[in-house]
Structure formats: structure tokens, C-alpha cells
């Protein structure tokens, strides 16, 4: 029996992710980069679907495997998980195809187990309604099994958010996110790019969250000339909303403290270039107008290279990349920046559907994260000039990492006030969980709780 190449690719990705504890998004990007033969959407659906529902699928399989899931060899278990996911969640795949293709995979990658896999999957199909039910007494245990999340994290989330919000968050984590792109409005209008993409067969819709984001369906966007020309970038609506919120248009110097992989850096740089271009078009002089500059800090060299590559593709010459630890102060930048973005490392609890491995993490050291976040914000605040702004953002719904950080910072910094706060979350407005707060450094105030004084 010939093996379906898409399912083979999905199997190999799942095996590598499980064995080596890799991030699914990175492994899939590596696997699917530039290969036109593969059905990328189908592979992503199976890989993400299996990872998102792993505990639930294993709970089902335990009903049909006498020795239990935990004693089943990994190769067989991954094939069974793929089969159950296709049968239970993928209406486009007939049950017989899910079984037959799983058997074909077993003959190649789990030799001698094809009969066992065939029997388990057929037995599941015969008993699908009863087997799919989660029959446990505790509410938290139910959430952990049905939405495939370690019980310890479920307990943490319920303590943070309450039961109903935790349930909504975990349900949201099982939904597919729309593919969105940020238009490089320094080069082309949103309408202009939408027209070009529609002419190539793509379906485009305007984002409700950002006026320079399009929701796109219809094919391999990164292989279009428009992508290669730097007319757009793949970026979530929520991430672009942070750059919109920061609003770097009029800034002369912006410092992005945790810049890699560079999406928000580039989004701000595009804002600045577009504003500069508009200013030049209104100026009668022949001399060009400076667009301002972004200093992008990143602690790791290989991730700094990602920012530089993004800048080159988009044609952005107003970004300077520095390999630097954001918790350490750069003396020559103190008091120089119009805008500082502190998009800090966080628990990622707001983006579980994009990083489903978060649900299975052994533990979260929230105290350590909070200390890092405080240190980055503290260091970043020193770069802000009087009258300048400091934007703090995360992709988590944990109040300790969000409002808690801001409250702590403001209690020690009378020279800053909170101008604006935005919360995105599945249980408030249906988006992934992001937090943003814009702080302004007020002229005539001094730090360390000294109150308002003349300077």
C-alpha cells in the first residue's frame, strides 16, 4: 500500500516534536518551507490537531488498548493519534481513509503493528459516541482531559481567571486562527495589495483589529512576488495591534527591547517610513526628511539575524540591530528615546492555540518570569526622554504578568503615568490573549516616589 506523502510528513513532524520536545510551529516551518508537492494546510491541520488534543485522544485510546497508552510504542501511538484525530475532527476525511492510511503508515514505520492499529481504529469507529465522552466527576479534571491541558495548569488558570474564563480560554485554544498579513504601507496601500492578491486567486478581508492587516485565504502566500518584494509580512492581528498601539509615526528614536523575530520592529519601522514619505510629499524642498530610527535589541545572535533578514526583505533601512541583554542598561541611550517598546518574554498563556505545547509544560516559574519582566521594564524606562512613551506588552492573560507589573512599576516611578490600557482575550473580545499599557514620562516629575518637583 502506497503511503500518502502528506500524512507521512505529518507523522515525521509529530515524531520529532514528541521525541525532541520541539516547538510545533518551528518544526512545521522547517518541514514545509518551499515544498510545493505537499498539502501544507492538511499537514498543519493534522499536526496541530493532534498536539492540541493529545490528552483527550489518549484518553479515548486508553479505552481500546488493554496495556494502556503509556505502554504503547511511540511510533504506533502517533499513528493512532493521527487516525483518531482524522476520524473525530476532520469531516473532509472519510473514516475508511483514516483507517487505511494509518495502516499504511504502520507498515512503514511501526512494522508488525498494522493489525493492531487497524483493530483499534475500527473498534473506535464502532463505539465513537460513547468512546468520545469524558466520564469523570471533577470539573477541573474534565477540562484537563477534554481540552488536553495538564491538570496543574488547569488549576493555575482557574485560580487566575475563574472556571468559566478558563473553559473559554481552553476552548479558544482548539480553534484555528485566521491567516493574517501586515501590509507594508510604506510601499503599497492596503487596498492596492488586496487587489493584487485577489487577482491571483486569494480571498482577502479587512481586519477588525488593525487597519493595515488583511485576513487571507487561498494558497502559499510566501511564494508570491508580493511577498518577495516586501509588500507584506505574515503576522497575527494581535501582534500588529501592539505596533499600532505603540504608534511610532512621529518618533525620532524608538528602542525595541526584545525585538526578535522582528515583526513588531518592522511594523513600527514601516509606520515611521510611511509618515516620512507623506511628509516629504508635502515638502517643496529637494532635501529628504529623516524617518527616524529604531534600535532593535535581541539577546541571541541567531535571533538578531532574523530581524536583519526581515529588514532586508521589507526594504527597511531605519532599523539598527544590537545583540544585547535587555535587562542591562546601555548608558549612551539613557534619556534619548521618544518611544520604548517592552514586549517582554512571558508565559504565553494568551497564545496557546498557536503554541499548543504550552498546555503540556511541566511547570511555569511565574515568579522568575515576573522578575525578568520587571527588570526589562525598569531598564527600558531609563531610555525614555521626558515627554516620551514606554509601551509594555505581553501575550499572556496572567494578571501577575500584566496589571501586576504595571502597578509595581508605577508605585516606584512618579515620573510615569498610565495613558492607555488594552486587553485582548477570548473571554472579552474573542482574540488571543494580549495585554498592552502605554506609559508617559511626565515633564517636571522625578522618579523614586519623590513627587512633583521642578527639574
Q: How should each PLM-predicted stretch be described?
A:
Residues 1-455:
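S-adenosylmethionine
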Amino acid at each position: 500500500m502506497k503511503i500518502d506523502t502528506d500524512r507521512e510528513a505529518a507523522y515525521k513532524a509529530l515524531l520529532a516534536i514528541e521525541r525532541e520536545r520541539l516547538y510545533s510551529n518551528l518544526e512545521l516551518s522547517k518541514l514545509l518551507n518551499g515544498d510545493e508537492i505537499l498539502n501544507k494546510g492538511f499537514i498543519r491541520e493534522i499536526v496541530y490537531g493532534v498536539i492540541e488534543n493529545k490528552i483527550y485522544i489518549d484518553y479515548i485510546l486508553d479505552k481500546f488498548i488493554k496495556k494502556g497508552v503509556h505502554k504503547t510504542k511511540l511510533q504506533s501511538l502517533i499513528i493512532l493519534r493521527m487516525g483518531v484525530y482524522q476520524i473525530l475532527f476532520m469531516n473532509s476525511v472519510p473514516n475508511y481513509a483514516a483507517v487505511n492510511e494509518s495502516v499504511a503508515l504502520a507498515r512503514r514505520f511501526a512494522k508488525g503493528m498494522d493489525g493492531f492499529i487497524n483493530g483499534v481504529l475500527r473498534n473506535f469507529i464502532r463505539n465513537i459516541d460513547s468512546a468520545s465522552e469524558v466520564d469523570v466527576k471533577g470539573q477541573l479534571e474534565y477540562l484537563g482531559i477534554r481540552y488536553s491541558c495538564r491538570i496543574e495548569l488547569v488549576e493555575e488558570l482557574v485560580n487566575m481567571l475563574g472556571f468559566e474564563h478558563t473553559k473559554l480560554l481552553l476552548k479558544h485554544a482548539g480553534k484555528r486562527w485566521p491567516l493574517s498579513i501586515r501590509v507594508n504601507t510604506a510601499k503599497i496601500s492596503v487596498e492596492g495589495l488586496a487587489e493584487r492578491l485577489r487577482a491571483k486567486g486569494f480571498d482577502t478581508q479587512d481586519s477588525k483589529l488593525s487597519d493595515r492587516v488583511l485576513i487571507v485565504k487561498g494558497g502559499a502566500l510566501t511564494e508570491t512576488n508580493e511577498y518577495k518584494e516586501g509588500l507584506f509580512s505574515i503576522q497575527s492581528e494581535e501582534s500588529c495591534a501592539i505596533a499600532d498601539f505603540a504608534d511610532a509615526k512621529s518618533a525620532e528614536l524608538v528602542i525595541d527591547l526584545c525585538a526578535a523575530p522582528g515583526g513588531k520592529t518592522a511594523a513600527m519601522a514601516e509606520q515611521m517610513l510611511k509618515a516620512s514619505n507623506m511628509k516629504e510629499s508635502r515638502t517643496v524642498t529637494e532635501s529628504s526628511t529623516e524617518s527616524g530610527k529604531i534600535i532593535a535589541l535581541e539577546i541571541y545572535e541567531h535571533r538578531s539575524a532574523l530581524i536583519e533578514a526581515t529588514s532586508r526583505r521589507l526594504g527597511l533601512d531605519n532599523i539598527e540591530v544590537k545583540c544585547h541583554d535587555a535587562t542591562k542598561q546601555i548608558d549612551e541611550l539613557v534619556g534619548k528615546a521618544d518611544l520604548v517598546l517592552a514586549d517582554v518574554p512571558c508565559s504565553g498563556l494568551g497564545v496557546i492555540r498557536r503554541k499548543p505545547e504550552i498546555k503540556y509544560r511541566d511547570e511555569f516559574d511565574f515568579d522568575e518570569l515576573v522578575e525578568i519582566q520587571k527588570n526589562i521594564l525598569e531598564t527600558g524606562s531609563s531610555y525614555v526622554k521626558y515627554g516620551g512613551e514606554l509601551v509594555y506588552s505581553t501575550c499572556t492573560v496572567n494578571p501577575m504578568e500584566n496589571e501586576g507589573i504595571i502597578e509595581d512599576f508605577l508605585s516606584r516611578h512618579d515620573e510615569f503615568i498610565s495613558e492607555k490600557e488594552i486587553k485582548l482575550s477570548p473571554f472579552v473580545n474573542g482574540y488571543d490573549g494580549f495585554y498592552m499599557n502605554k506609559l508617559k514620562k511626565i515633564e517636571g516629575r522625578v522618579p523614586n516616589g519623590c513627587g512633583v518637583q521642578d527639574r
